[in-house]
Amino acid sequence: MDQSGVRNDAFGVDKFGLKNLKAVHWNLGTAALYEYALRNGEAELTREGALCAETGEFTGRSPKDKYTVRDALTDKTMSWSTNQSITPEQFAVLHADFIKHAEGMTLYAQDLCGGADPKFQIKTRVYTELAWHSLFIRTMLRRPETAALADFVPELTIIDLPSFRADPARHGVRSPTVVAIDFTRKIVLIGGTHYAGEMKKSVFTTLNFYLPEQGVLPMHCSANVGAKGDAAVFFGLSGTGKTTLSADPQRTLLGDDEHGWGPDGVFNFEGGCYAKTIRLSREAEPAIYDASLRFGAVLENVVVDSQTRAVDFDDGSKTENTRSAYPLDAIPNASPTGCAGQPKNIVMLAADAFGVLPPIAKLTPSQAMYHFLSGYTAKVAGTERGLGSEPQPEFSACFGAPFLPRDPTVYGEMLRKLIAKHNVDCWLVNTGWTGGKFGIGNRMPIKVTRALLTAALDGSLRNVTFRTDPYFGFAVPTALPGVPSDILDPINTWADKADFKKTAQALVSMFRQNFTKFEKLVDADVLAAAPDARQAAE
């Protein structure tokens, strides 16, 4: 077996059971991985310098193919109503078959860390069949110093083999695609999909399992920090604006997707960003646009001109879920440490497909807990398999239910205590539709959202007049300099006022119906923060 690159020979592939490999390339850098990816025909070089790969059939995550081993560790700690299980015996067979499948292969190995705070990070080794996958995960996780690689011992090991096909009868799964996690052995097996995002979300899921026991709240969020050290956290599902809104030139970027909130403050889990690029423009998002085109960026399913190799971010013919992975330091104002103090503001982003939520609302602590557990947004086409071309309303607990091994109330109660302890202001922001529901109205102008967020984060929004929303009970500003007053009250943007009322009542009913599963698990003040039952659809 040929090996190249810096590595810990005392803890090599044999420790994972890998054998009879053709070669292993350890901890290769960007240029070398470009060479292998291009030589292997895995990807193409774009005119501006980014590497572009296609993921084929799978252009998003496959949540129905994700499994966790149910054993003594997880039996009482996992939420099995929202997570699928396999037995230790089934995982052992699957693991052995992965090892067998890898024989004769050339693998790429990266030794990385999940978590910017050394006290809470997890050392992660990732074996990939594809060179571009190795570049992707090297970009997305945090890289240790080169000197640390010689004695690197992983706590978590991931092996990603897109050419592997699971056998449902043999492995206890539903299809040839599989993402299987064993928290006891700290092993993740990914097969049957080229979608690189499965790797990063597997690390996130692992941290979501272990960190609560260490007093750290793991969060599906972006985060940034102001000049005065005032950190802000942005919750939201894919497509709600986490990446876009946290990339504020006036604030330092911590990260765009995954963070922990611990005793010392907020810290990024990652070392890169994973931005949606559909209709990305330099005019609207210059920092993300430039970062996505530079040498070292990895593009997924973006259309590239076959002659000029120019990138077309407006073309969604392959998928709406086109993506760019780029290192955090590609953003001019990114934090070099990935760490900040305690947050001053929490923002919950919702892409409201019904167009009835206001562009911004201030939440009480109880309302914040309610909306965090509700996790309302709209699924956007392409970020998961099986969705049509239209967004679908979704309630995803903690704005990240697919990644939560434990019961959502574990994370919700942690958030509530942290908000109270640090006196955090909480906001709900609609980045979805205004002037009507999807298909009738328009997407909320990003300039309006940015203006409202700036006012919230700099404290000036505390000094304006608020009204109480008749449907949801939260406080909504009535006017703000530089923002059209009509847009602040959604009914004013609808041509058909009766249809607005009917649609708002329907959404109230959806909120209340969704929350029934939490009613016996939360305090009375959180229940009282629900939308007004009298406004629910009859």
Curated annotation (Swiss-Prot):
InterPro entries in the cross-refs: PEP_carboxykinase_ATP, PEP_carboxykinase_C, PEP_carboxykinase_N
Residues where ATP binds: 201, 220, 236-244, 285, 323, 449
GO cellular component labels: cytosol
Similarity-based family: Belongs to the phosphoenolpyruvate carboxykinase (ATP) family.
GO biological process, one term: gluconeogenesis
Enzyme class: lyase
EC number in record: 4.1.1.49
Protein keywords: ATP-binding, Cytoplasm, Decarboxylase, Gluconeogenesis, Lyase, Manganese, Metal-binding, Nucleotide-binding
Stored CDD domains: PEPCK_ATP
Chief place where the protein resides: cytoplasm
Pathway the protein acts in: Carbohydrate biosynthesis; gluconeogenesis
The protein's name in its UniProt record: Phosphoenolpyruvate carboxykinase (ATP)
Catalytic activity: oxaloacetate + ATP = phosphoenolpyruvate + ADP + CO2
Molecular function in Gene Ontology: ATP binding; metal ion binding; phosphoenolpyruvate carboxykinase (ATP) activity
Domain of life: Bacteria
Species this chain originates from: Afipia carboxidovorans (strain ATCC 49405 / DSM 1227 / KCTC 32145 / OM5)
Gene expressing this chain: pckA
NCBIfam families xrefs: pckA, PRK09344.1-2, PRK09344.1-3, PRK09344.1-4
Binding residues annotated for substrate, in chain numbering: 61, 195, 201, 323
Cofactor entry: Mn(2+)
Binding residues for Mn(2+): 201, 220, 257
Annotated function: Involved in the gluconeogenesis. Catalyzes the conversion of oxaloacetate (OAA) to phosphoenolpyruvate (PEP) through direct phosphoryl transfer between the nucleoside triphosphate and OAA.
HAMAP family in the record: PEPCK_ATP
Pfam families recorded: PEPCK_ATP (PF01293)
